[in-house]
Regions:
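Positively charged n-region of N-terminal signal peptides that target proteins for export
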Residues: 1-4
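Sec-dependent N-terminal signal peptides
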Residues: 6-9
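C-terminal motif of bacterial Sec signal peptides marking the signal peptidase cleavage site
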Residues: 15-16
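Extracytoplasmic/periplasmic copper-protein system
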Residues: 19-44, 90-110, 151-162
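Extracellular/periplasmic metallocenter environments
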Residues: 24-30, 72, 119-162
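N-terminal edge beta-strand
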Residues: 37-67
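Beta-strand cores of secreted/periplasmic/IMS beta-sandwich domains, seen most often
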Residues: 57-81, 86-88, 130-138, 143, ...
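Extracytoplasmic beta-sandwich strand-turn segments characteristic of Greek-key/jelly-roll folds
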Residues: 94-138
């Protein structure tokens, strides 16, 4: 009986080890990729966060084209303590003077009276967004910034119009 069991185990071992696994052939079919949604070349998405940063320091546009700018605040702190906006200044405006005047303009969301701006968004807090459309008619390098008190020195960049 032991011999029979030993022979049976040996045969079972030979059968299980002697067979190579079947090699499967894979074929890959080319699949036409669906076009992804393309954002217009004149649409700019600018993100801001609770660390007082914009995700871009240089923005570009073409002369005379309408620019659609979407400002997102990806943080969680409300606009009373960590508000952000986008303000595009006209050429020749002194950034420091403008920012000092903006700090005193709380009732107008830190946008001082006057005609120093080309465009600006509303002040937004964590999880909020604002979208604006504007056109710049002259080529040049303009300054954009956030006018919430204390932010403009870090949250600023160049808006290049070609």
């Amino acid at each position: 009986m032991k011999k029979l069991l030993a022979q049976f185990c040996f045969v079972l071992l030979v059968i299980s080890c002697g067979n190579e696994p079947k090699k499967e052939k894979f074929s890959y079919d080319r699949v036409k990729e669906e076009p992804k949604e393309v954002v217009d070349s004149n649409t700019i998405i600018l993100n801001s966060n609770d660390q007082m940063l914009f995700d871009k320091s240089v923005l570009k546009a073409k002369v005379g084209e309408e620019v659609n700018l979407l400002l997102n605040h990806t943080g969680q702190i409300g606009k009373e303590f960590m508000g952000h906006n986008f303000v595009l200044l006209k050429n020749g405006v002194d950034v420091d003077d403008f920012a000092q005047a903006a700090m005193l303009a709380k009732e107008s969301e830190y946008i001082p009276a006057g005609d120093d701006t080309i465009a600006y968004t509303s002040m937004i807090g964590g999880g909020e967004s604002d979208q604006i459309s504007f056109t710049v008619d002259e080529p040049g390098t303009y300054v954009f910034l956030c006018t919430f008190p204390g932010h403009y020195q870090i949250m600023r960049g160049e808006f290049i119009v070609e």
